[in-house]
């Protein structure tokens, strides 16, 4: 906000004074302060779906602490769709009977040193057919702030029919360019409206756009106040869905940075539809992508393998690196690289072949931007590999990955 003010001395002094007395102004520009690194936590949708209730969320918070996930960096406990009840005569939203006291639940989550997230839609109905925020944006933002909400996922859902623009992604259909532009502008305004509503509560709230990437959201979401935005349709708990989504992020790296992140959807690790190697691929790829790490499994029932994948601190450190640079593909055989602070680089070498013999894949160090030998550490084997001269050849398991940290 202060950056917008003229740089004259009096303006600078006024800004400094304003920030001392109203520190929330510092976060109010959706600056990097709200999510300086990609948000980490848990979301109810992938495992619990429409059945999620108060007890499930409390159990998730308990497990986040007991398992060590909180200490590994997972902080947000996010309720997805289906918590919404009816509005009262004044238009205030209430939770449904699955969530008897939302404020008490938020207090419980906070008492564990965690943060509390919630879900709504700019449309009249959410994707699950529950009450959305359409026409009640400020009122809902005020309610969330009163409950102690720290994170809002805002899901387009029924707002698509308000936009009357189903064909935004299908230009071949007979829709005029003007109509497309109008629909896009309406969507942007709807997202910005909630952004302004959240700001005026003066509570820092991470703002997550969920509209499946429509209209190249990564190009305009930061301007509309988004801290993260879904880039694709919903993920499923299988290798095909996860790898299609993950590897299709190539090219979006220039849109991410501290405070504004591409979101290829939540983690499926621990949900049972993939092998441990394939889940290691999701964890590694999401870390290379500087993607939000929102676990989507039942945290109260994790086996040792699931814990070891979700809580690999060396991989988490790649995701959470303070430079906030999203990695990119550096070689056709799915070799990806993410620059890290201090000049180090994370490199992930993926084997995407599931139904044939695994083949050796060679990383050329110069493709990762190194000239001369490098130190190498294997982040899944947790072991130093010594010095690499000019290349490194490995055979990652089918659907699996070898992930390295390289430095000179
Ligand atoms: C959409 C979103 C999902 C989930 C559901 C809930 O499909 O993309 O992540 O929030 O809605 O209804």
Report residues per predicted region:
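Bacterial N-terminal signal peptides
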Residues: 12-23
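Structural recognition of the beta-strand scaffold that forms the well-ordered cores
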Residues: 38-44, 73-79, 115-120, 150-155, ...
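Aromatic-lined carbohydrate-binding/catalytic grooves of carbohydrate-active enzymes
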Residues: 60, 64-178
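Aromatic-lined carbohydrate-recognition surfaces of secreted/lumenal glycan-active proteins
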Residues: 110, 114-131, 187, 195-216
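Glycan-recognition surfaces
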Residues: 139, 199-298
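Catalytic cores of secreted or luminal carbohydrate-active enzymes
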Residues: 281-329
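Carbohydrate-binding surface patches
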Residues: 286-289, 294-296, 330-370
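C-terminal beta-strand-rich structural cap/linker in extracellular carbohydrate-active enzymes
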Residues: 387-408
């Amino acid at each position: 906000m202060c950056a917008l003010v003229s740089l004259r001395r009096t303006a600078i002094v006024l800004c400094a004074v304003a920030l001392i007395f109203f520190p929330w102004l510092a976060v109010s520009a959706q600056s990097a302060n709200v999510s300086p690194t990609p948000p980490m936590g848990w979301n109810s949708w992938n495992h619990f779906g429409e059945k999620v209730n108060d007890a499930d969320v409390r159990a998730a918070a308990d497990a986040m602490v007991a398992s060590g996930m909180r200490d590994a960096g997972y902080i947000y406990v996010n309720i997805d769709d289906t918590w919404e009840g009816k509005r009262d005569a004044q238009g205030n939203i209430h939770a449904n009977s699955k969530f008897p006291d939302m404020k008490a639940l938020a207090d419980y989550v906070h008492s564990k040193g965690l943060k509390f997230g919630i879900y709504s839609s700019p449309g009249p109905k959410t994707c699950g057919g529950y009450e959305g925020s359409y026409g009640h944006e400020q009122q809902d933002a005020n309610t969330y702030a009163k409950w102690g909400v720290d994170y809002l996922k805002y899901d387009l859902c029924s707002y698509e029919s308000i936009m009357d623009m189903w064909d935004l992604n299908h230009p071949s259909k007979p829709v005029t360019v003007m109509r497309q532009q109008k629909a896009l502008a309406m969507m942007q305004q709807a997202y910005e409206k909630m952004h302004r509503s959240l700001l005026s509560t003066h509570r820092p709230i991470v703002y997550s756009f969920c509209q499946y990437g429509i209209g190249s959201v990564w190009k305009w979401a930061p301007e509309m106040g988004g801290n993260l935005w879904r880039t694709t349709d919903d993920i499923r708990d299988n290798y095909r869905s996860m790898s299609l989504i993950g590897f299709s992020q190539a090219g979006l790296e220039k849109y991410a940075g501290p405070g504004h992140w591409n979101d290829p959807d939540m983690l499926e690790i621990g949900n049972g539809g993939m092998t441990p190697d394939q889940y290691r691929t999701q964890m590694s790829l999401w870390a290379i992508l500087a993607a939000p790490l929102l676990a989507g499994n039942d945290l109260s029932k994790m086996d040792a393998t699931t814990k070891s994948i979700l809580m690999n601190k060396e991989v988490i450190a790649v995701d959470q690196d303070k430079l906030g640079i999203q990695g990119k593909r550096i070689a056709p055989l799915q070799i990806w690289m993410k620059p890290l602070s201090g000049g180090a680089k994370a490199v992930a070498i993926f084997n995407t072949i599931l139904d044939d013999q695994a083949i050796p894949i060679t990383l050329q160090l110069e493709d990762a931007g190194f000239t001369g030998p490098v130190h190498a550490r294997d982040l899944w084997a947790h072991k130093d590999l010594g010095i690499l001269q000019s290349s490194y050849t490995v055979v990652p398991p089918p659907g699996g990955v070898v992930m390295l940290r390289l430095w000179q």
